[in-house]
Curated annotation (Swiss-Prot):
Protein name: UDP-3-O-acylglucosamine N-acyltransferase
Disulphide bonds in the chain: none
Record-linked InterPro entries: LpxD, Trimer_LpxA-like_sf, UDP_GlcNAc_AcTrfase_non-rep
Subunit field text: Homotrimer.
Entry annotated with the keyword Membrane: no
Classification lineage: Bacteria, Pseudomonadati, Pseudomonadota, Betaproteobacteria, Burkholderiales
Record's GO cellular component terms: membrane
Amino acid sequence: MSTRLGDLVERLGGRLIGDADIEVVGIAPLGDADASHITFLSNPKLRGQAAQTRAAALILSAADDEIVAANYQGARIVADNPYAYFARAAQLFAALHAYVAPAGIHPTASVDPQAKVAASASIGPHVTVEAGAIIENACVIDAGCFIGRNARIGAATHFYPRVTFLAGCSIGQRGIVHPGAVIGADGFGFANEGGAWIKIPQTGAVSIGDDVEIGANTSIDRGALADTVIEDGVKLDNQIQIGHNCHIGAHTAMAGCVGVAGSAVIGKYCTFGGAAMVLGHLTIADRVHISSGSLVSRSIKEPGQYTGFYPLAKNAEWEKSAVIVRNLAAMREKIREMEKTIKSLGDEQE
C-alpha cells in the first residue's frame, strides 16, 4: 500500500519541495532506498551519501537542504527535526502495512466470566484472564499472556506473547509490552531476624501510565504497601529490573539491563545508558542523563550528564579524573625521578 508525498506532509507537517503526487510505499536507509521509498538525513556526516541516494524523497533539515539540494534531484521534505519526522513517518507506514488482529476471544483462551473484555479487543490463543480484569477497546493480547485478578489494560494497548500481568496492576492507553515481560511479581522485601529472613507481603501493585513501552523480559515489581509507579511516556528496553515502590517520571528512557533498586524516585525526561545501576531509596532530579555502566550511589539534585562507576560525578569532572587515572603510572615514575634528584641534591650539599 502506497501513500502520496503530499498526503504525508499534510499529515505530518514539514515543507515539501517537489512533486506532491509521488507515491511511496515505505522508508529505507540512504544507501538502500529506491524510487518507491523516502529516506532521511539526520547526521551531517552523511550529506555525501544523501546526495547520491535513489530515494523518491529525502527528509532533511533546512541547513542540510542548502548543501544537499544542488546534487539531489528527488523531492525534499524540510523538517525542524528530521529524525523525529522519520519516526512519525515510520509509524504511519507501519500502520499501513500492519497485521490487524481479529476482534474476539480465541477458543483456547480462558476468560473468567467476571472479567470484562471489550468487544473490539483481540484475545489470542491460550491467554488467561482472571476474574475482575478489565481489557478495554482495541487491545491486542497475544498468545500465552496471563492477566491477573482485577488487572486493568487501557485502550489500544498491545501485549506481545507470554506477557505476565499480575493481580491489581494497571496500564494506560496505547501501551506496548514485549514478550516475556513480568509486571507485578513480588518485590524483594524481607526483614532480618537473627540471620533468618522474614518475607514482607507485597500488597501494592504496579501502576503504569499512557504510551509506555516495556521491553522483552523486563520485570517491574509490585510495591510493598503502595504501588510501583511508571508515569506516561516511559520507554524501557529489554531485561530491565525495576524494584518495588520505585517511581519513574514521565518520558524517562532506559536502555537494556538497567537495574533500579527499590524505592528509588527518578524524575521526568531522564535517560539511562545500558547496564546503569541505581541504588535504592535515592532521588534523581528531572533531565538527568546517566551514562552506560554507571553506578548511581547517591541522590542527584541537578540536571546534567553523569558518568562513572565510583564515585559518580558530573560527566565533565569524570572525564578529567579519568585522564588523571590513566596517567597515574607515568606520574609515579616522574615523582620517583624527582625524589631521586632532590635526594642527590641534598647529598651534594652535605
